[in-house]
Amino acid sequence: MTFIHPTAIVDPAAKLADDVKVGPWTYIGEGVEIGAGSVIESHVVLKGPTQIGCNNHIYQFSSVGEATPDLKYKGEPTKLIIGDNNIIREGVTLHRGTVQDRGETRIGNNNLLMAYVHVGHDSVVGNHCILVNNAALAGHVIVDDYAILGGFTLVHQFSRIGAYSFTGMGSAVGKDIPAFMMVAGAPAAARSINMEGLKRRGFSKDDIAKLNKSFKLIYRRGLTLEAAIEELTPLAQDCAAIVTLIASLRASKRGIVR
């Protein structure tokens, strides 16, 4: 059965699954929905409209579903949607969307958001991502599956972080990061493919070799992005990873980090 600490405040219009646990001094507002198996620790603030899936664990002093500080926001109904099996550590801030964009901020499944991470309005975090302490996403950012953002990484509005990519500590990301790349610095620059991450995720030696060749083609030969994509295309015929890489290059709207 649901356990709600006597000092917690839960709005009658909030919807909690039968086995949700709510710690002391937590506030859960109107329009909040929390799925089965979730644990909300002490001193958490949840505001709606916010949908939280199953088996999420939200730690103390996090602010989840607060309105965006975007000055264009005038109180319109917008959402925060969180999937399943996420760990949201201490002091994390997750803001709802704006009607000027998609109207919702979205966190996928199986993510780890470490202490003091910020996810701004209208951002989308995929699945199996790790955002290390104090990483901050400005509004409208997309983080694709299995990306890892190092501590104190800052990401500019409308940037996209590609799948399986990695940012070094303190990176300042102002452009799009292609899939599989490792970047570092302020401003962030591409250093190599995310070699260790790809090994851990079970990519074959052949795929890693082709991605390493692709990195050199994109970043070491002085090609335009269009020319690099053209030369990469033959490699994609028997390599799904190269297909993913090309798709991330074509999806870039801000230009890629160099």
From Swiss-Prot:
GO terms for molecular function: acyl-[acyl-carrier-protein]-UDP-N-acetylglucosamine O-acyltransferase activity. Its EC number is 2.3.1.129. Keywords: Acyltransferase, Cytoplasm, Lipid A biosynthesis, Lipid biosynthesis, Lipid metabolism, Repeat, Transferase. The keyword Transferase applies. PANTHER family: ACYL-[ACYL-CARRIER-PROTEIN]--UDP-N-ACETYLGLUCOSAMINE O-ACYLTRANSFERASE (PTHR43480), ACYL-[ACYL-CARRIER-PROTEIN]--UDP-N-ACETYLGLUCOSAMINE O-ACYLTRANSFERASE, MITOCHONDRIAL-RELATED (PTHR43480:SF1). Belongs to the transferase hexapeptide repeat family. LpxA subfamily. This is Acyl-[acyl-carrier-protein]--UDP-N-acetylglucosamine O-acyltransferase.
